[in-house]
Regions:
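N-terminal nucleophile
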Residues: 1-200
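TPR/TPR-like alpha-solenoid helical repeat scaffolds
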Residues: 232-259
Length: 262
């Protein structure tokens, strides 16, 4: 990616508008070394031969922010800095875009990724980019430093080429959230899996439901997977044979009974 850079427990950088990619990773390095966003921004722009055409935003783990929109960025361009967030845009049809993004972010509910997506939809509703639509990304990391570099990424979803990138991003975020709650066996989660019909989630949930004694619900979800691809039935048998994922002979009897009844 070019625009989005983030590291758990450190902060995030967005570099765009004739983007100079190095502002992203090197900006993160400065934040990690202890520089506050304002100082990190100043140091990065001092090394940029054309800061007037760039747009860069930095935020650290304490929600301190610095945002720069160069004087020669392609209009309409600008930014809005709020309480713990920044919205920035360039090459927009309207100068109202970043304000609308901020309103949507503040006015929406849900987790951070959902609110960020709401801001993106608000930008598009305000006519968005003069070039049209193609790509989008959501990147969210933990505010706490993690032990290992591969930990701490909460959401990282990219749509590189799509006629409706925000709708696709929304679809993928919902799928991501469903996977994140794959072990949840409450009524709401089960109902959602029935609605979306994702065979993998249905398969693994069905195993958990058998283990919790919810056999009827387990069979209903298992059928979603079995009807999608016979390989899920084979996987169930192989898991039992190898003693994996808590699958036992009782699990097989409970779930394959679904097909025997048919």
């Amino acid at each position: 990616g070019v625009v989005c850079w983030a590291k758990a427990g450190i902060g995030a950088v967005a570099t765009q508008a004739m983007a100079l990619i190095e502002h992203g990773p090197l900006g993160i390095e400065l934040l990690e070394d202890g520089a506050q966003p304002q100082e990190a921004m100043k140091r990065r722009l001092s090394l940029d031969k054309s800061p007037e055409i760039r747009q860069v935003a930095m935020i650290d783990y304490k929600s301190r922010i610095s945002t720069h929109t160069g004087s020669d960025t392609i209009p309409e361009s600008g930014h809005f800095v709020g309480d713990g967030f920044s919205c920035q845009a360039n090459m927009m049809w309207k100068s109202t875009v970043w304000g609308c993004m901020a309103d949507a972010f503040v006015g929406s509910e849900g987790d951070l990724s959902s609110r960020m997506l709401a801001a993106l939809f608000a930008a598009e509703a305000e006519q968005g980019d003069i070039r049209g639509k193609q790509s989008a990304r959501l990147l969210v990391v933990d505010s706490d430093i993690q032990q290992y570099p591969w930990e701490g990424t909460i959401v990282d979803i990219r749509v590189d080429d799509n006629r409706e990138p925000l709708e696709e991003l929304d679809r993928l975020l919902k799928m991501h959230n469903e996977y994140a709650n794959i072990n949840s066996l409450d009524e709401k989660s089960i109902s959602q899996t029935k609605h979306t019909g994702n065979p993998e989630i249905a398969f693994w949930k069905s195993i958990g439901l058998v283990q919790s004694g919810q056999i009827s619900e387990a069979r209903e979800l298992a059928l979603i997977a079995f009807e999608e691809n016979s390989g899920w039935e084979e996987l169930l048998l192989r898991c039992a044979k190898n003693g994996l994922a808590g699958v036992t002979d009782d699990t097989i009897r409970a779930l394959l009974h679904t097909k025997q009844d048919d």
